UniProtKB/Swiss-Prot annotation:
Coiled coil: none annotated. Signal peptide: none annotated. The lineage of its organism: Bacteria, Bacillati, Bacillota, Bacilli, Lactobacillales. It is found in: Cytoplasm. Keywords: Cytoplasm, Methyltransferase, rRNA processing, S-adenosyl-L-methionine, Transferase. Belongs to the RNA methyltransferase RlmH family. NCBIfam families: PRK00103.1-3, tRNA_RlmH_YbeA. Its EC number is 2.1.1.177. Specifically methylates the pseudouridine at position 1915 (m3Psi1915) in 23S rRNA. Gene3D superfamilies: 3.40.1280.10. It comes from the Bacteria. This is Ribosomal RNA large subunit methyltransferase H. The keyword S-adenosyl-L-methionine applies. It comes from Streptococcus sanguinis (strain SK36). It catalyses: pseudouridine(1915) in 23S rRNA + S-adenosyl-L-methionine = N(3)-methylpseudouridine(1915) in 23S rRNA + S-adenosyl-L-homocysteine + H(+).
Length: 159
């Protein structure tokens, strides 16, 4: 199985980089993990709705260019489905049963995701109604991916 994270924006904080690196190292025994960071578009302080839409579209097109036809795409969006960790673990494992060997997770930038990215996604997923920095969301997501594998292994990590 190959897992790809397509994210908008450069990760700057060392503590987040260190946490993500640790979980990526742990995941190596289960799957190949690839992190793709796309440059975010500069957003003016008082951007108009039209400017925001144009920025979303540019970022969305960059994201779509990194998604292959045969990947199962899970886009993180506030309106998406919420899952307990056990259900998320089962969902990840079920994708292989349905003929997908690659799962791509998408995390948008500060403006969210362009509608075409949401449309391309096989699943919209949410970690709740809270607003989190998209950089922090990377760490939360990769930990949950690791937890999903630990649940499948019957590991006490999940307790």
């Amino acid at each position: 199985m190959k897992i790809k994270l397509v994210t908008v924006g450069k990760l700057k904080e060392k503590y987040l980089k260190d946490g993500i690196a640790e979980y990526m190292k742990r995941l190596n025994r289960f799957c190949k993990v690839e992190m793709i960071e796309l440059a975010n578009e500069k957003t003016p302080d008082k951007a108009s709705d039209l400017e925001n839409q144009q920025i979303l579209e540019k970022e969305g097109n960059k994201i779509l260019a990194k998604i292959n036809e045969r990947e199962f795409v899970i886009a993180l969006a506030i309106e998406g489905n919420q899952f307990p960790s056990e259900k998320f673990s089962q969902l990840m494992m079920d994708t292989t049963v349905h003929g997908f060997s690659d799962i791509t997770f998408v995390i948008g930038g500060s403006l969210g995701l362009y509608p075409a990215v949401k449309k391309r996604a096989n699943l919209l997923m949410s970690f709740g109604k809270l607003t989190l920095p998209h950089q922090l969301m990377r760490l939360v997501l990769i930990e949950q991916i690791y937890r999903a594998f630990m649940i499948q292994q019957g590991s006490p990590y999940h307790k």
